Amino acid sequence: MDPNTVSSFQDILMRMSKMQLGSSSEDLNGMITQFESLKLYRDSLGEAVMRMGDLHSLQNRNGKWREQLGQKFEEIRWLIEEVRHRLKITENSFEQITFMQALQLLLEVEKEIRTFSFQLI
């Protein structure tokens, strides 16, 4: 896994956890949880690709991995839309920078997950 992506995830999660968005703090906590889940999923796919030929192990561990992959892409799309919405409504420059970086990271991770999944198919 790219060390820059790891530090980007950690940096964005740390900054998002410090943000105070008033009544929408539950939504933000949900976004943080989904970011963490997405990172773990991306890492596990990356590890499977690194071990090439580990497709059978992945399928045995999770017989519905294609369905799970589709769900992760739906989560990514939802997160992208949510981050874009937050970016439009916030006036705080710290939050704008954080959400812009989160959006960039989501697009990068979506591309990486697509690449990993094509290698596993």
Swiss-Prot record:
Q: Does the keyword Transport apply?
A: yes
Keywords of the record = Host nucleus, Host-virus interaction, Transport, Virion
Matches recorded under Pfam families: Flu_NS2 (PF00601)
What is the official name of this protein in its record? Nuclear export protein
The UniProt annotation puts motif Nuclear export signal at 12-21, 85-94
The listed locations are: Virion; Host nucleus
Q: What does this protein do?
A: Mediates the nuclear export of encapsidated genomic RNAs (ribonucleoproteins, RNPs). Acts as an adapter between viral RNPs complexes and the nuclear export machinery of the cell. Possesses no intrinsic RNA-binding activity, but includes a C-terminal M1-binding domain. This domain is believed to allow recognition of RNPs bound to the protein M1.
Q: How does this chain assemble?
A: Interacts with protein M1. May interact with host nucleoporin RAB/HRB and exportin XPO1/CRM1.
Q: What family is this protein classified in?
A: Belongs to the influenza viruses NEP family.
Q: Which domain of life is it from?
A: Viruses
GO BP, sorted A to Z = exit of virus from host cell nucleus through nuclear pore
Q: One cellular component GO annotation, for this chain's record?
A: virion component
Give any extra note attached to this record.
Average number present in a viral particle is estimated to be 130-200 molecules.
* InterPro entries recorded: Flu_NS2
